[in-house]
Amino acid sequence: IAFNLYKPIQQHDRTKIIDIVSLFGYYYRNIGLVVLGGGIIVSLFIPMIFGKSDFSFGVIYFAFYSYLASSLIGYFINYRQALLSADQRNYVVAVYYQSANILKVIIQLTIAYYFANFYVWIAIELSFGILYSFILNKKIDQVYPWLKCTVAIGKSQSKNYPNILQS
């Protein structure tokens, strides 16, 4: 989909950019719903998969749903970052991601050393995923203040771009 943004970006066609990014959000929301459904189904089998684990099921479920939530953030919230990539500004994503990741690992290592608490480790993982998404989306709003995307726009544009997934 980022490929489809090159021409509208070059032509400064904001309407088309909004349409394509909204369409991307629509597709990603649908994929996210499938991933969510699959994750819920897989979670039903956790007792069979981890039946002989030394970890409590509370920790296992908390970790599973936290990582699932972190993954779903990309599908439901971060889809607009494709515009940064297509606009040759992927360095913004890299800077924010690497900075957040370094800080997260330092905090997790400190927590692991002093407290050895799995729940806190996992909560930090999820918290930084949410924080990263929030900061990245604020930056996208700053760089592209005109970018007002909605899933409704994306759904309505799916018929106007029938071949967008093939490119």
Predicted regions mapped to residue ranges:
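Interhelical loop/hinge segments that connect adjacent transmembrane helices in multipass membrane
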Residues: Y119, F134-S167
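Helix-loop junctions and terminal segments of transmembrane helices
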Residues: I1-Q11, G25, A86, Y144-K148
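Alpha-helical transmembrane segments of multi-pass membrane proteins
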Residues: G37, I41-L44, M48, D54-I77, ...
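Alpha-helical transmembrane segments of multi-pass membrane transport and lipid-handling proteins
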Residues: G25-K52, I106, T110-Y114, F134
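Signature of the first transmembrane helix
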Residues: I1-K7, L36-G39, S70, K104-V105, ...
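Substrate-agnostic recognition of the 12-TM MFS/MFS-like secondary transporter fold
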Residues: K7, G25-Y28, G74-K104, N163
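Membrane-interface helix-loop junctions in multi-pass transport and translocation proteins
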Residues: G58, Y91, I102-S133
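Interfacial transmembrane-helix starts/ends
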Residues: L5, T15-N30, Y161
